Amino acid sequence: MGYVVSTFYRFVHLSNYYDIQSVLKEFCVQHDIKGTIILAEQGINATIAGAQSALNQFFSFLDLDNRLKDIQHHESFSTHNPFSKMKVKLRNELVRLGIENFDNSVCGEYVSPQNWDDLISRSDVYTIDTRNTYEINFGKFKNAINPQTKCFRDFPEWAVSWASDKVNQDPIIAMYCTGGIRCEKSTAFMKNLGFNKVYHLKGGILEYFKSTKNTNNLWEGDCFTFDDRIVVDDNLVPGRVKCVSCDVHVTREEMKSVTRGNVLCFNCREVAKV
């Protein structure tokens, strides 16, 4: 049996987000759906996996709430369920930028996957990867700037420093991330800093892979995923990952305990404990 992996998010006011937690958890458990859903007053952010029929029922269930109706989701596939359990978490901030009461309603302009290559190929465009360094190490777009962040909360400090000599130049900025939520929020931050021409990849890297197959080879490497697959290639096929210490391919079981891109085989992990 194959599994569908679905990522989705929506910034929307959910005043009763804490009441939704148990309802979503119960539905997912009943339909053998696993993964992580994050709920906050600002909306919902999730990656879940299960049978296609189960996910179809899940999104029909979400449609019952007008705030979550017709939510756009991006699908990829796996031979196994890349999640071991179902989690529905409550957060004060949907995606943690670390700035209290930050308003991300005024954000950048979407660019479709089909138009993305033309944008980032321009010599007057700064392409910024809003993911963390451990993710970028597996792959990125050609010539993209790596902010060298360990977590998304580090991004504002980097952005303020980077912007200090560029705001007055009124540059064109193109931003991207895995599924779209971090680049959407980061474009709002860049707009807040005074940049006007700010764009972000609609649907993120995963939708870009699905829509374009990386035809122009502007993507280099694999894309890190926050599940047991660790990475997928530009055909959305789980890649083979090597241990960062001994360079052997790690097994699927070893991948299940990988944290933040620190890929170690069992042997090297044991050595590291000594």
UniProtKB/Swiss-Prot annotation:
UniProt domain Rhodanese: residue ranges: 121-217
Keyword presence, tRNA processing: yes
Active site positions: C177
EC annotation from Swiss-Prot or TrEMBL: 1.14.-.-
Keywords per UniProt: Oxidoreductase, tRNA processing
Keyword hit for NAD: no
Enzyme class, spelled out: oxidoreductase
InterPro entries listed in its UniProt record: Rhodanese-like_dom (IPR001763), Rhodanese-like_dom_sf (IPR036873), TrhO (IPR020936), TRHO_N (IPR040503)
Reactions mediated catalytically: uridine(34) in tRNA + AH2 + O2 = 5-hydroxyuridine(34) in tRNA + A + H2O
Pfam family membership, one: Rhodanese
GO molecular function: oxidoreductase activity, acting on paired donors, with incorporation or reduction of molecular oxygen
Biological processes annotated in GO: tRNA modification
SMART domains associated with the record: RHOD
UniProt-listed HAMAP family: TrhO
Protein family according to the UniProt entry: Belongs to the TrhO family.
Task of the protein: Catalyzes oxygen-dependent 5-hydroxyuridine (ho5U) modification at position 34 in tRNAs.
Protein name: tRNA uridine(34) hydroxylase
Gene of this entry: trhO
